[in-house]
Swiss-Prot record:
Upper lineage: Bacteria, Bacillati, Bacillota, Bacilli, Bacillales
Main location, first listed in the record: cytoplasm
Entries under Gene3D superfamilies matching the protein: Winged helix-like DNA-binding domain superfamily/Winged helix DNA-binding domain (1.10.10.10)
Biological process terms in GO annotation: response to stress
Other known facts: In strain Becker, gene disruption may lead to increase in alpha-hemolysin (hla).
DNA-binding region per UniProt: 55-78
Any one GO cellular component localisation term in the record: cytoplasm
The name this protein goes by in its record: HTH-type transcriptional regulator MgrA
SMART domains according to UniProt: HTH_MARR
Single GO molecular function: DNA-binding transcription factor activity
Keywords associated with the record: Activator, Cytoplasm, DNA-binding, Repressor, Transcription, Transcription regulation, Virulence
Function description: Regulatory protein involved in autolytic activity, multidrug resistance and virulence. Negatively controls spa (surface protein A) transcription. Activates type 8 capsular polysaccharide (cap8) and nuclease (nuc) biosynthesis. Represses coagulase and protease production.
Database matches in PANTHER family: ORGANIC HYDROPEROXIDE RESISTANCE TRANSCRIPTIONAL REGULATOR (PTHR33164:SF5), TRANSCRIPTIONAL REGULATOR, MARR FAMILY (PTHR33164)
Localization of this protein: Cytoplasm
Length: 147
């Protein structure tokens, strides 16, 4: 059997499987107590860095489209993780704010990424190198998308 047909030799399968394993770890070990999803955590991470922000910033930072982000934000608002407010200057612009609930869970989730890095059994240097290589892959596909 050639390497081309061996799943373990396919970059795409390795990326897919690693992503599934990391998401499972986040869901079962890190976020379960908070009934939080990884995309919700990413939104909170953006807001913990800077709040309020407009929806466009979240869309850009997460590299998702508005059609994906809007329902995500709606669910987060329903469980009191964020508050959405229309701009007084431009009613088309919506700002996202943290809530008391999202501020309360912040200290407990501040090291979530460290927990995953630790569980991965990679050294800090290996994590940096993996992030560099993944950034290269992401950039290459972004370039392909633009052509």
């Amino acid at each position: 059997m050639s390497d081309q047909h061996n799943l373990k030799e396919q970059l795409c399968f390795s990326l897919y499987n690693a992503q599934r394993q990391v998401n499972r770890y986040y869901s079962n070990k890190v976020f379960k107590k908070y009934n939080l999803t990884y995309p919700q955590f990413l939104v909170l991470t953006i807001l913990w860095d800077e709040s309020p922000v407009n929806v466009k910033k979240v869309v850009t930072e997460l590299a998702l489209d508005t059609g994906t982000v809007s329902p995500l934000l709606k669910r987060m608002e329903q469980v009191d993780l964020i508050k959405r407010e229309r701009s007084e200057v431009d009613q088309r612009e919506v700002f996202i704010h943290l809530t008391d609930k999202s501020e309360t869970i912040r200290p407990e989730l501040s090291n979530a990424s460290d927990k995953v890095a630790s569980a991965s059994s990679l050294s800090q240097d290996e994590v940096k190198e993996l992030n560099r290589l993944l950034g290269k892959v992401i950039h290459a596909f972004d370039e392909t998308k633009e052509k």
